[in-house]
């Protein structure tokens, strides 16, 4: 793959090394001063009287047009003002971006105008006699609990997988068979980097498989130190590269952990701080990758990070057409279909992938990769109606909204770093 374009200064000329270093230091310092938890706490405090034991976006009495709704709108405007004041210091903070999107959703939901009165600041000082305990602030390293407390609902999740020769199921339910060799990024966002390396199953063979997977969990404030996990065929470790099995010594270090369901063939990595679970398997001398990730995390990337197989599927030039997939291989197609049908009765994309892999490789054990990929999808998908895919030859195009995400993310990051 080619290198990403070099960053440019606002005036168009390449910035010097010292300028880049200064900008990185400033942005890093700003990141460490993010006050989003204070904004969250003030919002929860200001809505306590509006709730009857429900979530912050469920006002008590009066409906959307009642007095409680008016109080909620004032609280939301205060919340939005607080996030704007701390925006420059919250670059790359998942809690901040989640709060901004949540405020927008709630203001639309409750028909709140952007202009208007705000809630009074929360009272300071000792608790009054007889008052109950202060509301608990959600653990910043428990993504699902924090999201549910903020939005009053469970977060959305996306699923991606790569297995076999290799086949990719993208976040948007595209299903491609790829001709890729070498290292390709499955994910590359602000929190997570995943790279898969494919090579021929043997010298001169037409079939390629994933032989190596590298995962980088990027440093995240009080939650985890940066951790690297690397798996290769016949070497599926039960620890990160530094020998640890969690996110380090930070307060939220336990929010990243490795578990082994079957040593040497099945590893599960849970990253609760970003609402993510990853399964890596080894079957028939190949690796497979499967992930369930929070939507906010999957979409947190810039224009320079747009080449991600989990986001856009295989590049068009690297996709195998239907005619290429149906060419005769080492095993006859009818024989491969019979072998795959035993474990995959539905003739969906997983079944077709199995037929291709068994036919091209000549190895009946390739049926296991497709079967376990389907099993993982059954676990990870929130909507099982999307379990079985029957894709067209090219796969559905990305919607304009999805294509705009990298551009908008890049503009937002630039604004945070350079606005004054």
Curated annotation (Swiss-Prot):
GO biological process entries: activin receptor signaling pathway; BMP signaling pathway; intracellular iron ion homeostasis; multicellular organismal-level iron ion homeostasis; negative regulation of BMP signaling pathway; negative regulation of transcription by RNA polymerase II; positive regulation of transcription by RNA polymerase II; protein autoprocessing
Record-linked InterPro entries: RGM, RGM_C, RGM_N
Modified residue annotations for Phosphotyrosine: 43
Prodomain positions: 394-420
Site (Cleavage): 165-166
Lipid sites, type GPI-anchor amidated aspartate: 393
An annotated Gene Ontology molecular function: transferrin receptor binding
Pfam families given in the database record: RGM_C (PF06534), RGM_N (PF06535)
Disulfide bonds: 141-223, 160-310
Membrane topology: Lipid-anchor; GPI-anchor
Biased composition (Low complexity): 125-134
Localization, UniProt: Cell membrane
Region (Disordered): 113-135
Signal peptide interval: 1-32
CC per GO annotation: BMP receptor complex; cell surface; extracellular space; HFE-transferrin receptor complex; plasma membrane; side of membrane
Post-translational modification: Autocatalytically cleaved at low pH; the two chains remain linked via two disulfide bonds. Also proteolytically processed by TMPRSS6, several fragments being released in the extracellular space; regulates HJV activity in BMP signaling and thefore iron homeostasis.
Positions annotated as glycosylated: 111, 206, 365
Keywords from the named record: Autocatalytic cleavage, Cell membrane, Disulfide bond, Glycoprotein, GPI-anchor, Lipoprotein, Membrane, Phosphoprotein, Signal
Tissues where the protein occurs: Muscle cell lineage.
Annotated function: Acts as a bone morphogenetic protein (BMP) coreceptor. Through enhancement of BMP signaling regulates hepcidin (HAMP) expression and regulates iron homeostasis.
Family statement drawn from the similarity comment of this UniProt entry: Belongs to the repulsive guidance molecule (RGM) family.
Self-association state and partner proteins as the record states: Interacts with BMP2 and BMP4. Interacts with BMP6. Interacts with BMPR1B. Interacts with TMPRSS6.
PANTHER family: HEMOJUVELIN, RGM DOMAIN FAMILY MEMBER DRAG-1
Name of the protein described by the UniProt record: Hemojuvelin
Lineage, broadest ranks: Eukaryota, Metazoa, Chordata, Craniata, Vertebrata
């Amino acid at each position: 793959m080619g290198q990403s374009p070099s960053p440019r200064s606002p005036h168009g000329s390449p910035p010097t090394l010292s300028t880049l270093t200064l900008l990185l230091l400033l942005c890093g310092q700003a990141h460490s001063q993010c006050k989003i938890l204070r904004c969250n706490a003030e919002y929860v405090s200001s809505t306590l009287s509006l709730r009857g034991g429900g979530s912050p976006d469920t006002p008590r009495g009066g409906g959307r047009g009642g007095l409680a709704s008016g109080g909620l709108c004032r609280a939301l405007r205060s919340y939005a003002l607080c996030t704007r004041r701390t925006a420059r210091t919250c670059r790359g903070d998942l809690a901040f971006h989640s709060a901004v999107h949540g405020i927008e959703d709630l203001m639309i939901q409750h028909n709140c105008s952007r202009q208007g009165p705000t809630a009074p600041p929360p009272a300071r000082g000792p608790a009054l006699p007889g008052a109950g305990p202060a509301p608990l602030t959600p653990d910043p390293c428990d993504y699902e609990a924090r999201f549910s407390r903020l939005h009053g609902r469970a977060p959305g999740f996306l699923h991606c997988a790569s297995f076999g020769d290799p086949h990719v199921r993208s976040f948007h339910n595209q299903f491609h068979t790829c001709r890729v060799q070498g290292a390709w990024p499955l994910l590359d966002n602000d929190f997570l980097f995943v790279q898969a390396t494919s090579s021929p199953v043997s010298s001169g063979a037409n079939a390629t498989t994933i032989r190596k997977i590298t995962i980088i969990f990027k440093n995240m404030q009080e939650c985890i130190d940066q951790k690297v996990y690397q798996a290769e065929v016949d070497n599926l470790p039960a620890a990160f590269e530094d020998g640890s099995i969690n996110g380090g010594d930070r307060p939220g270090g336990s929010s990243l952990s490795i578990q082994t369901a079957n040593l040497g063939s099945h590893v599960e990595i849970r990253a609760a701080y970003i609402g993510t679970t990853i399964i890596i398997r080894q079957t028939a001398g190949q690796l497979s990758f499967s992930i369930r990730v929070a939507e906010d995390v999957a979409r947190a990337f810039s224009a320079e990070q747009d080449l991600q197989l989990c986001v856009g599927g295989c590049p068009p030039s690297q996709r195998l057409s239907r005619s290429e997939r149906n060419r005769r291989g080492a095993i006859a197609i009818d024989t491969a279909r019979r072998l795959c049908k035993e474990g995959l009765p539905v003739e969906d994309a997983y079944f077709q992938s199995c037929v291709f892999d068994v036919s091209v490789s000549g190895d009946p054990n390739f049926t296991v990769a497709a079967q376990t990929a389907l099993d993982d999808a059954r676990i990870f998908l929130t909507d099982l109606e999307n379990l079985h895919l029957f894709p067209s030859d090219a796969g559905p195009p990305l919607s304009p909204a999805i294509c705009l995400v990298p551009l908008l993310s890049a503009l937002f990051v630039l604004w945070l770093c350079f606005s004054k």
